[in-house]
């Protein structure tokens, strides 16, 4: 049984500040995406890893050790996130992949235990996604003022890697018109059941400048491998 990981790193996000997209900025001396790749390369249940990049980032990507050594395959992304994922899925078609994990390149702190849980969840469901229950109070705002509250019962903060049986999510992407926020949306549009798996608070997506400092603190607190 072959499990592939797709690391989506084709975005041009600038909210993190700096001259480079967030996935190429340094985190404790390494590009964010290099740390993300390392997590999946070390996962015993992952047999193949694809990195989806923007064409302008090819030189940076080819300089990554995992890419230079041939252990990670590059795929150029599309005009949107779902188009980028579709390109990677098509690159895996016909190559004997049973399961696929789709992960944000800007989530470098994904834990091995979470990767394992996601793969195992596919024994019982065609799709699975990690999530953390919403614990903060939720407000509705208008014009800079609070105008109401929102019941948080049953609400979750979505994370990645989102896991799917390969042929099911490939068919779902081929049928989807585009514009999905994530792969769970694509899967559900195709009628696929998606199980919720316990996520991890440390599995943050590096998005804003302050996220780098938090991620470095979390890395420092981790035991040495």
Curated annotation (Swiss-Prot):
Site residues (Transition state stabilizer), renumbered to this chain: 15, 22
Family of this protein: Belongs to the IspD/TarI cytidylyltransferase family. IspD subfamily.
Catalytic reaction(s) noted: 2-C-methyl-D-erythritol 4-phosphate + CTP + H(+) = 4-CDP-2-C-methyl-D-erythritol + diphosphate
Keywords: Isoprene biosynthesis, Nucleotidyltransferase, Transferase
CDD domains linked: CDP-ME_synthetase (cd02516)
EC number assigned by the record: 2.7.7.60
The protein, known as: 2-C-methyl-D-erythritol 4-phosphate cytidylyltransferase
Species of origin: Cereibacter sphaeroides (strain ATCC 17025 / ATH 2.4.3)
Entry annotated with the keyword Hydrolase: no
Family matches, as PROSITE patterns: ISPD (PS01295)
């Amino acid at each position: 049984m072959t499990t592939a990981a797709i690391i989506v790193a084709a975005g041009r996000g600038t909210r993190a500040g700096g001259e480079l997209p967030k996935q190429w900025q340094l985190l404790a001396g390494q590009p964010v995406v290099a740390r993300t790749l390392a997590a999946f390369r070390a996962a015993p249940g992952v047999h193949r890893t694809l990195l989806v990049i923007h064409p302008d980032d090819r030189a940076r990507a080819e300089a990554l050790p995992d890419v230079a050594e041939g252990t990670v395959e590059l795929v150029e992304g599309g005009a949107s996130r779902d188009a980028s994922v579709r390109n990677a899925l098509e690159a895996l078609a016909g190559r004997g992949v049973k399961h696929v994990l789709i992960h944000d390149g800007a989530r470098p702190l994904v834990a091995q235990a979470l990767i394992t849980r996601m793969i195992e969840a596919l024994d019982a469901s065609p799709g699975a996604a990690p999530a953390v229950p919403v614990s903060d109070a939720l407000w509705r705002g208008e014009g800079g003022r609070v105008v109401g509250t929102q019941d948080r019962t049953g609400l979750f903060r979505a994370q990645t890697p989102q896991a799917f049986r390969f042929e099911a999510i490939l068919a779902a992407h081929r049928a989807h018109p585009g514009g999905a926020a994530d792969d769970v949306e694509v899967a559900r549009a195709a009628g696929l059941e998606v199980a919720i798996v316990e996520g991890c608070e440390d599995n943050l997506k590096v998005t804003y400048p302050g996220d780098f400092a938090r991620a470095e603190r979390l890395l420092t607190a981790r035991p040495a491998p």
